[in-house]
Amino acid sequence: MRIAKIANTRGVDSDARKHHHAGWMLLGCMVISVFLCYGQIRNSKALLAVCLLAFLGFVVLSCGRNAVFAVLLYFLPWSPLLRLDNKSVSFFTIALLAVCLVYCLKDHLSFNTYQSVLAFFLVLLTLAAKLWQGNPIRNNYLFFVCMLFLLPSVVEKSNAVSFKEATLFFAAGVVMAALIAQQTAGLPNISKYINVQSYLSITRRSGFYGDPNFYAAHITACLAGVQLLLSREEKRVHQLALLALMVLLIYCGLLSASKSFVLTTAGLFLAWVPILLEKGHRTSKFRLLLGIMCAGAVIVSSSAFEPLFEVIDERFSYAANISQLTTKRTDLWMDYLNEFAHNVSLTLLGHGYTSVTLHGWASHNTIIQSVYQFGLLGAPLLFIWVALTLKRVRQGLKDSRSNWRYTLLMLVGVVIPWIALDILFFDEFFLLPVYVVLGSHYSKE
């Protein structure tokens, strides 16, 4: 009995130390992001250089504390500001590559055979496509190739990742970036990073991103994670804190006036129902349902949400047909499909991962973008590579059993918005699928 008590005490002390370290890591992230924003406002190259170096050092430091995934998710909404000017490469991309190199060096450059072979053939296909289409090799392509070879070595360490910690860091980063961007969007040195769309009586915020839908996709991904934490939380104080966080995320999402955010959020709450109906502690479940109803009442009745609902209502009022509902995305999709039907070489090989678009317009659909960039020969190789990478994530977890309800919720929050986005050129393509797998295997930590 005494041994059991000692073991239990040690476990509690260990958890307390982990939470203590996580708290300091989160505080460090917040301090860096605040000074980063101030440096951009003042256009101080010296301060920006210090912040960017501090960011890189902080990310490398977090590798040794098994908190790198959480730290990267925190800074994901800040990535547009993580650069010396709006034309240079984001240091977030550099940090992601640095993390992969650190872990690969720890493993003495060991590579997975199957994924390396897939990556090799994908590189050959893209180089052939570039040669055929006359497209140059640029830095974003080199980064993509490096990630194809290096990322599989990193995801094997996912057993040390805390989904709860990652979600809370992600939420803190999203909320801070959204609210600070809302207040600083009019400043000249910040406005060059932000695209605030205003027409008629509609104003659309996008955090520090140039696309409101891209910004909203971060929020739906994070919201799915918070809902998952809520469904497993039994402590009253923690439930209240998570409910407040959920309300904040919905507020930040509505700032985008994004129709896809509204539809995805509705899908999230529908996918949440089977999880809430799972067997569990009745008192805790009842308290949670009561809290959700109270949160809904706050959202509906709050004066802070009223103008946001008016903007959303006005946006939907213009949607007389499917083309207007999707903001002419369906027209773009038909243009791309028509191009595939008349251009055999493009359909088979693609453009070889370039910034080339059809008539200067992006496809606004990740699947169409995959075919346009990699062709029907390369796109399946890419999807198989992703599937094998996520399989390695799953195998590295303590509990390899997934919950289909959790998987559905995470897929709705993360993947559904990609139907209206071109995600392949962004760091989210490598990070967020891992987040989905971590959520689908989440158990009370």
Per-segment meaning from a language model:
Residues 54, 126, 164-193, 209-275, ...:
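Alpha-helical transmembrane segments of multi-pass inner-membrane proteins
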Residues 199-205, 284-288, 299-334, 355-358:
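Flexible juxtamembrane loops connecting transmembrane helices in multi-pass membrane enzymes
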Residues 273, 376-415:
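Hydrophobic transmembrane alpha-helices and their immediate junctions
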Residues 318-377, 393-398:
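Long extracytoplasmic/lumenal interhelical loops at the membrane interface
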Residues 54-59, 95-111, 118-182, 273, ...:
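Transmembrane alpha-helical segments and their membrane-water interfaces
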Residues 2-103, 128-129, 414-416:
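N-terminal signal-anchor transmembrane segment
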Residues 36-46, 82-91, 132-143, 209-216, ...:
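Helix-loop-helix junctions and helix-breaking kinks within/between transmembrane helices
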Residues 29-35, 270, 407-417, 423-445:
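Transmembrane alpha-helices of multi-pass inner-membrane enzymes
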